[in-house]
Amino acid sequence: MTNSPIASKAVPCRRIGTGPLHHFFGYYNKSNWDASGRYLLANQVPMMDADLTPDLVAEVGFFDLHDSDSYFSLGQTTAWNWQMGCQLQWLDGMPGHQFIYNVRTANKASFYPGFGSCIYNVDTKQVRQLPLPIYVAAPNSRYALCVDYRRLYITHETIGYGEHGPPRAMPHAPGDDGIHYMDLASGESHLLLSYRSLREFHPRVSMDRAIHWVSHIEINPASSRILFLHRWTERVKDETCFLHRLITVNPDGTDMRLLECSDHPLPQLADDFDPSAVGTFDYEKSEYQISHPLWMDDSHIIVWGPHNGEIHYHLYEDSEGGEVRVIGRDVLTENGHMTFSPTNKRWLLSDTYPDAATSQRILFLFDMESGLRHDLGSFYTDPDLRKENRCDLHPRWSRDGNQACIDSVHELQRQMYVLDVSHIVGTGGRTAVASNTRIFDKF
């Protein structure tokens, strides 16, 4: 393997959808293609950018890739944000074509009053409402994990849902809230892990006066193991003050393991520190950041974060004291949204945050066997977009491993694009592309 091998590859890229409306999916952690490859989930909104309010509506639906990429709106939601959308995801373990997403409800008796989720059956057009908003559904579609998005709105506004009026006061580490387990067939739920139990698990002094929350909850392919980031801070308005731990646990709450902790001194807590001086992406590029963990398989986790004094893409074995391996030491040198191909773990799809000078972001594939990085394109983003309304690429794989889908604003609209990477990954069966396909290196 040579040092810093990077190749540029021109790949077919086409925009999905036409007209004046805007489309996006949100996060990188799940495919928005259905199992057949025909339907591509997306939210539709009338604007590229807006401050989110509890009344702002997003359409919920999909593009039919077998019907001239026509968009079909199948519902609406006001429980969404620009980063994660409404947590749209296919339920592959259920019969037919079914997907789930978050909504606001009139149910004031639920554990999180006013919030829930819906399952939409594409084949029967039936909608079934569930009492909790989900963060992620298990691959077997038997259960989902749920959190309070009102807490996230206070601790990490970018991924939360707001309410009318001022934010409510939140206890720092309550014993009656945390990660909830919800059965997707019955809607029954119970508390899986409380914030108090997380604070008491290998406690740190920095936790004592901090507010706690969880994010990046992910379930392994076998639906038998859960990972999440436990975060805490005394200054929610300054993300560089966030502290992080990577933890795994069984779906019944047993066998909790601490894989990494980036607790560190925080000079930002000084009274004279100015959080407004922190750049939009300084937090994402922090040397202490643990972010974007995802299962490679049932027992290994890829993540950007520090280990033994160095920050890299790291591959963790899911065991305390297990092997931790640096991935792409001289090639993958900054934070990104990474996922492995669903058909060949040789291929890692990821991106970068915008370059401070050019506002360009790189989309790339990394070859785990050769160590070669294939840059697929460079996409401009408006530097005036803030943390809460930015548009990360958030690349997602198609089910056959031949294509990637991204969100982007490089054409001054928030839209989705599909890139054909089949000639790089060597899976064959190149997908025919529409007339608006462009071969590109930079936008």
Locations of regions flagged by a protein language model:
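Surface-exposed loop and turn segments in beta-propeller and other repeat-based domains
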Residues: 14-23, 73-82, 189-210, 260-286, ...
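Blade-terminus and WD-like Trp-Asp/Gly-His loop motifs, strongest in beta-propeller folds
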Residues: 30-41, 80-105, 135-143, 147-148, ...
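Beta-propeller blade signature
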Residues: 57-67, 114-123, 173-186, 242-254, ...
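Loop/turn-rich, solvent-exposed surfaces of beta-rich toroidal or solenoidal domains
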Residues: 289-291, 296-312, 328-374
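Asp-box/WD-like beta-propeller blade repeats and closely related beta-sheet repeat scaffolds
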Residues: 79-93, 100-178, 191-209
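Blade-loop segments of beta-propeller domains
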Residues: 22-30, 47, 53-106, 134
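Short, conserved, GDST-rich strand-edge loop motifs in beta-rich repeat architectures
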Residues: 43-57, 101-112, 147-176, 228-244, ...
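Blade-level signature of beta-propeller repeat domains, shared across WD40, Kelch, NHL, RCC1
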Residues: 389-443
